[in-house]
From Swiss-Prot:
<feature type="lipid moiety-binding region" description="S-palmitoyl cysteine">
    <location>
        <position position="10"/>
    </location>
</feature>
<feature type="region of interest" description="Disordered">
    <location>
        <begin position="13"/>
        <end position="117"/>
    </location>
</feature>
<keyword id="KW-1003">Cell membrane</keyword>
<keyword id="KW-0378">Hydrolase</keyword>
<dbReference type="GO" id="GO:0004721">
    <property type="term" value="F:phosphoprotein phosphatase activity"/>
</dbReference>
<feature type="compositionally biased region" description="Basic residues">
    <location>
        <begin position="29"/>
        <end position="38"/>
    </location>
</feature>
<dbReference type="InterPro" id="IPR004274">
    <property type="entry name" value="FCP1_dom"/>
</dbReference>
<keyword id="KW-0449">Lipoprotein</keyword>
<comment type="function">
    <text>Probable phosphatase. Involved in the response to sodium and lithium ion stress (but not to potassium or sorbitol stress) by inducing transcription of the sodium pump ENA1/PMR2. Acts through a calcineurin-independent pathway and is functionally redundant with PSR1. Also involved in the general stress response; acts together with WHI2 to activate stress response element (STRE)-mediated gene expression, possibly through dephosphorylation of MSN2.</text>
</comment>
<dbReference type="GO" id="GO:1903293">
    <property type="term" value="C:phosphatase complex"/>
</dbReference>
<keyword id="KW-0564">Palmitate</keyword>
<feature type="lipid moiety-binding region" description="S-palmitoyl cysteine">
    <location>
        <position position="9"/>
    </location>
</feature>
<dbReference type="GO" id="GO:0005829">
    <property type="term" value="C:cytosol"/>
</dbReference>
<dbReference type="InterPro" id="IPR023214">
    <property type="entry name" value="HAD_sf"/>
</dbReference>
<keyword id="KW-0472">Membrane</keyword>
<feature type="domain" description="FCP1 homology">
    <location>
        <begin position="223"/>
        <end position="381"/>
    </location>
</feature>
<protein>
    <recommendedName>
        <fullName>Probable phosphatase PSR2</fullName>
        <ecNumber>3.1.3.-</ecNumber>
    </recommendedName>
</protein>
Length: 397
């Protein structure tokens, strides 16, 4: 540090000696300096700020050239002035003189910044107006699209709802789902005249029935004489089926449609095997589905290899009421007081809601336990002490 200090001291003495040797400025040289400095300041623009002092013209030095170790002093900052007395055009280094600076640089800087702020505010105002116009156009576009969508949805809702289920391929007989109506139209399916009620037990033209009988099922076998009848839905109640590949499928059924074989992926509802084994001990079990037999029969063969399901009824056995497939319990051939239906669609049992045990539609939830949860209720209803299941279910559910 001593060596560096000596160098700095020598540099300071040299600077002082050099300043002492400078001859005094004359009026002629001062005018030349002022003219030369004015021209130079105009070419340098904002990077150099000229002071309006008649005696000296000094230029601010960029901050990058200032020494960071000066702590506010003028060491390291230099200005250049032409030496008029020497006549050789050399520039002598001068220390920056702030005491003679009558021009308020801070004020000029503030005015300059205020001008920038005003220009920025004007630009921002213009941009905000453009953004407001764009936002208004977008809002008008969204409102227009919303109105178009609302009109489209209104027209769609006015149309008859499509049939849900597996085979939505255009063939009239290849839809395995049991009901073509939507829940919103359930109340419209209820018969309103005495003629409608009297016709519920009569078979419709081309409606399936047990051979030699005017009912859907033949008379009870001896083994079921003391048991009530439990009717089960198939799709979304016991299983879920889809044409789309499902890695969790329990089995795959090849189904022929228009001379082409399609794979149907089937997953079983959790607890379905235990459920079927238990209810087969308590009831005469009937699977009644609105699906076509070419799909439902092979599915039931795979689902129930042990024969726990005693009867099977398909779409052709459904009661066609205003274009909807209804499971008419009055045509089963069993006393209504001993007949229960388990179905996920209220529209399918619209004629006899007091005999129904509702269950939610199932698609893939592996944590579902509804089939097992219903077993205790069915065990109670199977008791000989229950003379009319409809009166009990009408109060219980």
């Amino acid at each position: 540090m001593g060596f560096i200090a000596n160098i700095l001291c020598c540099s300071s003495d040299t600077s002082k000696t050099h300043r002492q040797r400078q001859p005094p400025e004359t009026n002629h040289n001062r005018n030349r300096n002022r003219k030369h400095s004015s021209n130079k300041a105009q070419t340098q623009g904002r990077k150099q700020k000229a002071t309006p002092n008649g005696d000296k013209m000094q230029y601010s030095t960029p901050e990058i050239l200032l020494s960071s170790s000066d702590s506010g002093s003028n060491a390291g900052s230099k200005t250049m002035q032409e030496n008029g007395n020497s006549g050789n055009g050399k520039l002598a280094p001068l220390s920056r003189d702030h005491s003679n600076n009558s021009y308020d640089e801070e004020k000029e800087y503030e005015d300059y910044n205020e001008g920038d702020v005003e220009m920025t505010e004007v630009n921002n105002a213009g941009e905000e107006e453009e953004e407001d116009d764009e936002a208004k156009e977008k809002q008008d576009h969204v409102v227009h699209e919303y109105n178009v969508d609302a009109d489209r949805n209104s027209s769609i809702n006015d149309e008859a709802p499509p049939q849900q289920g597996l085979y939505q391929v255009g063939q009239e007989d290849m839809n395995p789902q049991y009901v073509a109506s939507s829940p919103d139209n359930d109340l419209n399916l209820i018969p309103t005249t005495e003629e409608d009620f009297s016709d519920l037990t009569h078979l419709q033209p081309d409606q399936y029935h047990a051979p030699g009988y005017d009912t859907l099922l033949p008379p009870k076998l001896q083994e079921f004489q003391q048991k009530k009848c439990l009717i089960l839905d198939l799709d979304e109640t016991l299983v879920h089926s889809s044409f789309k590949y499902m890695h969790s499928a329990d089995f795959v059924l090849p189904v022929e449609i228009d001379d082409q074989v399609h794979n149907v992926y089937v997953i079983k509802r959790p607890g379905v095997d235990e459920f079927l084994n238990r209810v087969s001990q308590l009831y005469e079990v009937v699977v009644f589905t609105a699906s076509v037999s070419r799909y439902a029969n092979p599915l039931l063969d795979t689902l129930d290899p042990n024969g726990t399901i005693h009867h099977r009824l398909f779409r052709e056995a459904c009661y066609n009421y205003e274009g909807n497939y209804i499971k008419n319990l009055s045509q089963i051939g069993r006393p209504l007081s001993e007949t229960i239906i388990l179905d996920n669609s209220p529209a399918s049992y619209i004629f006899h809601p007091q005999h129904a045990v509702p269950i939610s539609s199932w698609f893939s939830d592996t944590h579902d336990n509804e089939l097992l949860d219903i077993i205790p209720l069915l065990e109670d209803l199977s008791s000989g002490n229950v003379l009319d299941v409809g009166s009990v279910l009408d109060v219980t559910i």
